[in-house]
Swiss-Prot record:
Residues 17-28, 175-196 have a biased composition (Low complexity). This is Oxysterols receptor LXR-beta. Disulfide bonds: none annotated. Forms a heterodimer with RXR. Interacts with CCAR2 (via N-terminus) in a ligand-independent manner. Interacts (when sumoylated) with GPS2; interaction with GPS2 onto hepatic acute phase protein promoters prevents N-Cor corepressor complex dissociation. Interacts with ABCA12 and ABCA1; this interaction is required for ABCA1 localization to the cell surface and is necessary for its normal activity and stability. Sumoylated by SUMO2 at Lys-395 and Lys-433 during the hepatic acute phase response, leading to promote interaction with GPS2 and prevent N-Cor corepressor complex dissociation.
Amino acid sequence: MSSPTSSLDTPVPGNGSPQPSTSATSPTIKEEGQETDPPPGSEGSSSAYIVVILEPEDEPERKRKKGPAPKMLGHELCRVCGDKASGFHYNVLSCEGCKGFFRRSVVHGGAGRYACRGSGTCQMDAFMRRKCQLCRLRKCKEAGMREQCVLSEEQIRKKRIQKQQQQQPPPPSEPAASSSGRPAASPGTSEASSQGSGEGEGIQLTAAQELMIQQLVAAQLQCNKRSFSDQPKVTPWPLGADPQSRDARQQRFAHFTELAIISVQEIVDFAKQVPGFLQLGREDQIALLKASTIEIMLLETARRYNHETECITFLKDFTYSKDDFHRAGLQVEFINPIFEFSRAMRRLGLDDAEYALLIAINIFSADRPNVQEPSRVEALQQPYVEALLSYTRIKRPQDQLRFPRMLMKLVSLRTLSSVHSEQVFALRLQDKKLPPLLSEIWDVHE
């Protein structure tokens, strides 16, 4: 099997084996927190490391890309005054009143004319927002409203003219056709929105569903690319040395735990980009991630399964057989179900959109332990279930069992998750310590 060309000597926290260094691109939790130990005051917390990687990335403003706003549920509140929110305005969930106030303040330079009769720290609500404009503007900025998002009168005029021109009917022309004679599908939806025959005739993805799928697929691609950059930092798989030596066994175990850390980081990065996830409270974010991470890792493992070689490939170049899993310290009772699940998933033949939707559905599982707002989690899950149902009916209209088969795989993952818990317990009996991040995500208490 292939291995990275560089060896690193930074110890994995808790087991004394090598692990990737903790530079800005490292998959470990130093990426954003700079400390491997929990921050002061968080000792004893079961989620100190997870909280760190859930924090927003501190990246330059110019690198942030505008994406579609998460779907509104109808009961969101304005981040400025607490009134009912109407949508995302100038980068913040806010009401129409605060949206208009912020725009007027920026366009007409109101900030220089506002004054506070108090100490400049007025508490803002639907009543006080009319009483103190200076503190209202301050609260707008604290909530995250960006002046650069506000268009000037001239920009608005040009945008209005451009929109009117786009709405004018184009000259008649023949629609572009695909090789099958149907109009070509829009990019990113695997032609699902344009396919249809038999039972699937007439079903179409809504514009919101197409946008959702495109966003999820793009987010997965972005997270995968970020993981590839961490490949050279992984402890090399020992080659040539005595495979039964203590050093070789430790190195193989460190290699696998570092791959797991990269995978966890990738899953957290993806979850933060799934519309609706960051609307949840921090406790529910942590609860959902703790319960779903191993199941998503198994889905991604199945995605990388090669039925011809009966091997699984991670990070493009790391390929593992059943024997490799066993040499890394995993039990046959866990290895065999992984490969059986991977073969079953391959028979379903999921594409990128189906995998992304299935992972999003898995994340928003309201019955997870310690979830504080299960009804809200369930409401966030529903649009992804509906999108997957429509997508599968369009893509495979003759296969009416495809959608329920996919959902049944989530049930299989629950069983595999239980087997994984037994595997983690077995590692403890072998005195193999997991890095802190994995210990927290899998609730391992030393």
